């Protein structure tokens, strides 16, 4: 769950089977697409929020990433209070036996978020949505949908094996043969690996998940390449 500190507006939230960095990035990207780019992002110290990829995403967005102090419950007071509210006003009132899928659960969560955002909040003497809309300091909007996608690309470096493959999260991918034995910069969205590519001299070279049968029958080029130009060793 992502909450706007000033207005208490729920700007992002979704239920997943796993709590991981990829899923948090998905929720954050959706929140920014809808409500804009925050000046600061204040998150927990868990591995889903304290990792190199999120740091690079925030740099691309121009967001200051801050983490709560370890074992300091008071620093997460607003969030913890909201989770208590969510449980008491919504979760505990659900007929769990009638929910048959995660998608249905998330539809109900979205309904709760809309209701919460438009319900009077005594602490701010307004509804969260009204307080957000009346704020003088509105978040920056993304330059474009494509720009926002590019900001959320995960970035890693890999050395290409002699069979023209690399591995990402234990999955093998084919890369263009011209990069064999070179170190390459990879850009990808964890929830859309079909769009992954090598970035070299501002050009994109698509990669694809390896078909082992096809790969073992592929002829490799023996053409000499100056790997120093692409970050590898001669």
Predicted segments with their positions:
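Acidic/histidine-rich, metal-coordinating catalytic segments
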Residues: 34-51, 69-71
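Hydrophobic "anchor" residues
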Residues: 9-10
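An acidic- and aromatic-residue-enriched active-site/binding cleft used to recognize and process polar
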Residues: 5, 15-18, 45-47, 63, ...
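Short, acidic, Ser/Thr-enriched surface-loop or helix-capping motifs
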Residues: 4-5, 199
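Charged alpha-helix within mobile-element recombinases
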Residues: 55-149, 190
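Active-site beta-loop-alpha junctions of metal-dependent nucleic acid enzymes
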Residues: 13-37
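C-terminal, beta-rich DNA-binding module of retroviral/retroelements integrases
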Residues: 117-234
């Amino acid at each position: 769950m992502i909450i706007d500190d000033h207005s208490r507006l729920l700007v992002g939230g979704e239920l997943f089977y796993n709590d991981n960095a990829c899923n948090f990035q998905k929720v954050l990207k959706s929140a920014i697409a809808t409500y804009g780019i925050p000046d600061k992002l204040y998150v927990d110290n868990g591995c889903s929020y304290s990792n190199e990829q999120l740091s690079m995403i925030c740099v691309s967005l121009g967001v200051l990433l801050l983490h709560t102090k370890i074992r300091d419950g008071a620093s997460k007071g607003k969030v913890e209070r909201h989770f208590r509210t969510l449980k008491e006003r919504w979760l505990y009132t659900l007929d769990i036996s009638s929910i048959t899928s995660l998608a249905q659960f998330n539809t109900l969560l979205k309904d709760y978020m809309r209701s919460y955002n438009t319900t009077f909040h005594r602490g701010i003497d307004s509804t969260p949505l009204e307080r957000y809309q009346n704020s003088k300091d509105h978040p920056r909007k993304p330059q474009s949908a494509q720009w926002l996608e590019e900001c959320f690309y995960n970035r890693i470096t890999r050395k290409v094996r002699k069979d023209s493959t690399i591995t990402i999260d234990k999955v093998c991918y084919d890369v263009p043969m011209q990069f064999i034995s070179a170190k390459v910069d990879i850009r990808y969205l964890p929830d859309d690996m079909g769009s992954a590519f090598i970035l070299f001299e501002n050009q994109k070279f698509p990669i694809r998940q390896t078909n082992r049968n096809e790969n073992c029958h592929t002829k490799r080029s023996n053409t000499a390449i100056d790997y120093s130009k692409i970050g590898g060793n001669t």
